[in-house]
Amino acid sequence: MSDIKTAVITGSTSGIGLGMAKGLAAAGMNIMMNGLETAAEIEPLRKSLEDSYGIQAHYSAANMMEPDGARGLIEAALSTFGRVDVLVNNAGIQFVSPVEDFPDDKWQAIINLNLSAAFYTTKAALPGMKQRGWGRIINIASAHGLVASPFKSAYVAAKHGIVGLTKTVALEVAEQGITVNAICPGYVWTPLVERQIPDTAKARGLTEEQVKRDVLLAAQPTKKFATVEELAALGQFLCTDGAASITGAALPVDGGWTAH
Ligand code: NAD
């Protein structure tokens, strides 16, 4: 078997996941991409990873909302590359509404994708990591895994949940060369954030500009969105041996938000 490590990144066809895919490809890893964009949108991204970094990149359309999809993504990576060394649980969605109007199906979808998918992928990826005595699991949580905001009940519940899952699995595998950490970004300018601005504006009776300035960046003392490149740099570091003692941590990348 080749020494080249394989990274599986859920939701890596856009935003933070795509940034992570670039960061880990730049570190020399083969990449299993995943996401719901069309094949025509994904193929240039996949090819660009191979061309820019000289690694192999494959793509799976597995739906992380479904347990079989999450398990299937790990199986696809194992049958393509023979190993999963790094797992980044990143795919996530948002829905904004007061709790009493929050649709039941949106609650369930957010719990399934933002929390349960990481349970199924972790379960499927751990046996191989244990066998090799090395592994990295990085869960993309959120500042909302540490603190709450109104109108995001499902998202905040799922993100607090994934921080709990991170700590629990970290303890279970601590002696086996596997680290498990959560990255907790504040606001990062990606399609997910862009899409929630109209709904937040409606829920709070504000203009979209007011939402950006007075709601999103009001919480972020730096008054700047974090970048996907900053998150990828942390992801890269967590995959080095220098980060071997960082495990069970929830690491904020939030411009000081959770220091309040
Ligand atoms: P994004 O909307 O840009 O990308 C989401 C990715 O997930 C896409 O590749 C999409 O295809 C994929 N996806 C969506 N549903 C899927 C499904 N059912 N199965 C497989 N893939 C699916 O979002 P983003 O802003 O890059 O967010 C990525 C993660 O970072 C999410 O978990 C989000 O909660 C978290 N996060 C984002 C921010 C931010 O400000 N953008 C802040 C904190 C945490």
Task: Mark where each language-model region is.
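Active-site helix of classical SDR
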Residues: 122, 158, 166
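Short, small/polar-rich loop/turn modules that mediate ligand/substrate recognition or access, typified
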Residues: 174, 179, 246-248
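Residue(s) in the substrate-gating loop at a strand-loop-helix junction
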Residues: 142
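Short C-terminal tail/terminal secondary-structure segment
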Residues: 146-147, 235-236, 247-260
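Conserved glycine-rich Rossmann-like NAD(P)H-binding loop of the short-chain dehydrogenase/reductase
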Residues: 27-44
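Conserved glycine-rich cofactor-binding loop
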Residues: 13-15
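Substrate-binding pocket helix/loop in short-chain dehydrogenase/reductase
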Residues: 98-99, 106-111, 137, 216
